[in-house]
Amino acid sequence: MALLWALAVLSHLPLLDAQSPECANLMTVAPITNATMDLLSGKWFYIGSAFRNPEYNKSARAIQAAFFYLEPRHAEDKLITREYQTIEDKCVYNCSFIKIYRQNGTLSKVESDREHFVDLLLSKHFRTFMLAASWNGTKNVGVSFYADKPEVTQEQKKEFLDVIKCIGIQESEIIYTDEKKDACGPLEKQHEEERKKETEAS
């Protein structure tokens, strides 16, 4: 899945290590509170990503479009995820969860008996966020970008591009999704109708 995949990919990269005050400001990782989790609640779209590793880029190119829902569970320090991803013109659905490490400002998921960690970067625009790894000169740096709408404003995009520049990746290396290629609309609608019926019955 786009979100869970990015968590796994980015977790293989070194953690944040700012090289300049400007980049440090952009890449500040803050503790995660209940308010932070509430900000992440709702529907999000996977906008794009950039990775130096060719294998990761190949995987990113396979994702034509993706969106997901996050549901906070404060007491459990986790986010329930419902993710819809379009690959080869087909919809792939997955339900899982992401663990929250509040003090470190990190997210994690367990895959193949291994826990994968990434840093959460909340945007100053609030309705976008990024998952990021290091820009410390390794060949595997990377960032993924998410927004609450399938299209972002120029200001939101600029913040993403500034982070990309900080980690030493060219703008031409960014791989964007295309919401017009989404094939998950019908399944999402079906799930919404099922949840509505369950709510009415309870």
UniProtKB/Swiss-Prot annotation:
<dbReference type="InterPro" id="IPR001500">
    <property type="entry name" value="A1A_glycop"/>
</dbReference>
<keyword id="KW-0964">Secreted</keyword>
<feature type="disulfide bond">
    <location>
        <begin position="91"/>
        <end position="184"/>
    </location>
</feature>
<feature type="glycosylation site" description="N-linked (GlcNAc...) asparagine">
    <location>
        <position position="94"/>
    </location>
</feature>
<dbReference type="InterPro" id="IPR012674">
    <property type="entry name" value="Calycin"/>
</dbReference>
<dbReference type="GO" id="GO:0002682">
    <property type="term" value="P:regulation of immune system process"/>
</dbReference>
<protein>
    <recommendedName>
        <fullName>Alpha-1-acid glycoprotein</fullName>
    </recommendedName>
</protein>
<keyword id="KW-0325">Glycoprotein</keyword>
<feature type="glycosylation site" description="N-linked (GlcNAc...) asparagine">
    <location>
        <position position="57"/>
    </location>
</feature>
<dbReference type="GO" id="GO:0006953">
    <property type="term" value="P:acute-phase response"/>
</dbReference>
<feature type="signal peptide">
    <location>
        <begin position="1"/>
        <end position="18"/>
    </location>
</feature>
<dbReference type="GO" id="GO:0005615">
    <property type="term" value="C:extracellular space"/>
</dbReference>
<keyword id="KW-0813">Transport</keyword>
<comment type="similarity">
    <text>Belongs to the calycin superfamily. Lipocalin family.</text>
</comment>
<dbReference type="Pfam" id="PF00061">
    <property type="entry name" value="Lipocalin"/>
</dbReference>
<keyword id="KW-1015">Disulfide bond</keyword>
<comment type="function">
    <text>Functions as a transport protein in the blood stream. Binds various ligands in the interior of its beta-barrel domain. Appears to function in modulating the activity of the immune system during the acute-phase reaction.</text>
</comment>
<dbReference type="InterPro" id="IPR000566">
    <property type="entry name" value="Lipocln_cytosolic_FA-bd_dom"/>
</dbReference>
<feature type="glycosylation site" description="N-linked (GlcNAc...) asparagine">
    <location>
        <position position="34"/>
    </location>
</feature>
<feature type="glycosylation site" description="N-linked (GlcNAc...) asparagine">
    <location>
        <position position="136"/>
    </location>
</feature>
<keyword id="KW-0732">Signal</keyword>
<feature type="glycosylation site" description="N-linked (GlcNAc...) asparagine">
    <location>
        <position position="104"/>
    </location>
</feature>
<keyword id="KW-0011">Acute phase</keyword>
